[in-house]
């Protein structure tokens, strides 16, 4: 198992190229199961979750060819398998995204209940109810979801009691081959949803209301779609993380290959803290702040402040003057990084879903353990400003969502080494 050894308090400067968005790539990979013709997907990040989804598609009978490290050609014309097995699905929760396309195209499928994420309860109930609204019969048998719609899916209203990104994505993919019109009410509004909609539209699906909380889909009355090639949008969470690298080290960094509009909740907060940002069409440059002020954050669905940036801002709060307050409203158990930040010297108190951070605090290098994907990046951020050497263990979490993180940070001047546990 690998760990990162990080020498703290090293000056940083330079530019970072942002990779394609993992959270856009995963549903788009799943959606290729709907396609009769081969599809080329560009700007795929080389991260563990993408490789796991590619392996799952291959296991279902899709043909895969990597044209270069970030471009994959997928052919799902002659799929011969509609069972997503536990061995593959347990590796990540996003595997549930194959449920909608498999059911829509083949009228029956078996999908293992997912694993792969340590952040509280992320129930699949919303996905199952959405499929039932479209006419599917669902049973849970020996840890598998067995979904059937012998006569095909039929358009209907799907009302989500709670906003769900993957639930919205699964409903969209299922509705794309359903007869008639489907309305998804209380839909998620993330940019990744908008890109999935554009991908489905390329195959002839009519979708209205993109970017709003109500989506209207007219399915293609056929047994498959003819989807077109697509380039994955830049990863707004990776971009936000590197902005936080600049912010926590108080360095001048330029973040390239981004869509600034997708980052507004993050950039607004950085400006409030005291940073000067030069925002261009596809880049943001962060300049050192004279004084970093404490702040308050409440995580919300897009376009609110993203829960996936909460941990990084908790690390940043340790270097801000005053008392910062972070309220997590979307997931339980999402403060597991707090105790590890405390090992580095952070002054953090927790009360249910609210964290209070007192700063500014001098952090000291230590051994810390990553507990989930975004927590791992928060520990790397803190280690960059800690006095001495830190070792971040269990970085397989980090590898799920960040492409070549140590290479990108080292290119800025950092001293980060990936080593093997003894």
Curated annotation (Swiss-Prot):
Catalytic residues in the record: 117
GO biological process, one term: regulation of cell shape
Alphabetized Pfam families for the sequence: EPSP_synthase
Cellular localisation: Cytoplasm
Binding site for phosphoenolpyruvate: 22-23
Source taxon at top rank: Bacteria
Major localization class: cytoplasm
Catalytic activity as recorded in UniProt: phosphoenolpyruvate + UDP-N-acetyl-alpha-D-glucosamine = UDP-N-acetyl-3-O-(1-carboxyvinyl)-alpha-D-glucosamine + phosphate
Binding site for UDP-N-acetyl-alpha-D-glucosamine: 93, 122-126, 308, 330
A Gene Ontology term for the protein's cellular component: cytoplasm
Residues recorded with modification 2-(S-cysteinyl)pyruvic acid O-phosphothioketal: 117
Assigned keywords, A-Z: Cell cycle, Cell division, Cell shape, Cell wall biogenesis/degradation, Cytoplasm, Peptidoglycan synthesis, Pyruvate, Transferase
Purpose: Cell wall formation. Adds enolpyruvyl to UDP-N-acetylglucosamine.
Assigned protein family: Belongs to the EPSP synthase family. MurA subfamily.
Protein name (Swiss-Prot/TrEMBL): UDP-N-acetylglucosamine 1-carboxyvinyltransferase
Native species: Helicobacter pylori (strain ATCC 700392 / 26695) (Campylobacter pylori)
């Amino acid at each position: 198992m690998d760990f990162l050894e990080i020498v703290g308090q090293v000056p940083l400067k330079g530019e970072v190229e942002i990779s394609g968005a993992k959270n856009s790539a995963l549903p788009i990979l799943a959606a290729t199961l709907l396609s009769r013709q081969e599809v080329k997907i560009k700007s795929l990040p080389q991260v563990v979750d993408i490789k796991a989804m590619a392996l799952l598609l291959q296991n279902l009978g899709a043909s895969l060819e990597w044209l270069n490290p970030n471009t994959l050609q997928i052919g799902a014309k002659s799929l011969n398998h509609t069972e997503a097995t536990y061995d593959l699905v347990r590796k990540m929760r996003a595997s549930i995204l194959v449920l909608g396309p498999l059911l829509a195209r083949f009228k029956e499928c078996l999908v293992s209940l997912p694993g792969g994420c340590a952040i509280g309860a992320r129930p699949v109930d919303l996905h199952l109810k959405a499929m039932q609204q479209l006419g599917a019969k669902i049973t849970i048998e020996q840890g598998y979801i067995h979904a059937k719609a012998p006569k095909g899916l039929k358009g209907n209203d799907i009302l989500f009691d709670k906003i769900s990104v993957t639930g919205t994505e699964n409903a969209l993919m299922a509705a794309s081959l359903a007869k008639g019109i489907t309305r998804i009410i209380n839909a998620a509004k993330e940019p990744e949803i908008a890109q999935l909609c554009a991908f489905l539209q390329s195959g002839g699906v009519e979708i209205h209301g993109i970017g709003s909380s109500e989506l209207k889909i007219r399915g293609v009355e056929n047994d498959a779609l003819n989807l077109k090639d697509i380039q994955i949008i830049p990863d707004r969470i990776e971009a936000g993380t590197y902005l936080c690298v600049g912010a926590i080290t108080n360095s001048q960094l330029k973040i390239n290959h981004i869509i600034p509009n997708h980052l507004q909740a993050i950039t607004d907060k950085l400006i409030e803290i005291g940073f000067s940002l030069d925002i261009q069409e596809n880049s943001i440059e962060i300049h050192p702040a004279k004084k970093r002020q404490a702040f308050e954050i409440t995580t919300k669905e897009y376009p609110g402040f993203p829960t996936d940036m909460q941990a990084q801002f908790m690390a940043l709060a340790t270097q801000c003057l005053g008392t910062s307050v972070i309220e997590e409203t979307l997931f339980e158990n999402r403060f597991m990084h707090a105790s590890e930040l405390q090992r580095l010297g952070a002054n953090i108190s927790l009360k249910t879903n609210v964290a209070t951070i007192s700063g500014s605090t001098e952090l000291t290098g230590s051994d810390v353990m990553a507990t989930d994907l975004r927590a791992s990046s928060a520990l790397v951020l803190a280690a960059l400003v800690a006095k001495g050497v830190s070792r971040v263990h269990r970085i397989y979490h980090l590898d799920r969502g960040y492409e070549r993180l140590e290479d990108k940070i080292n290119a800025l001047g950092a001293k980060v080494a990936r080593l093997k546990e003894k």
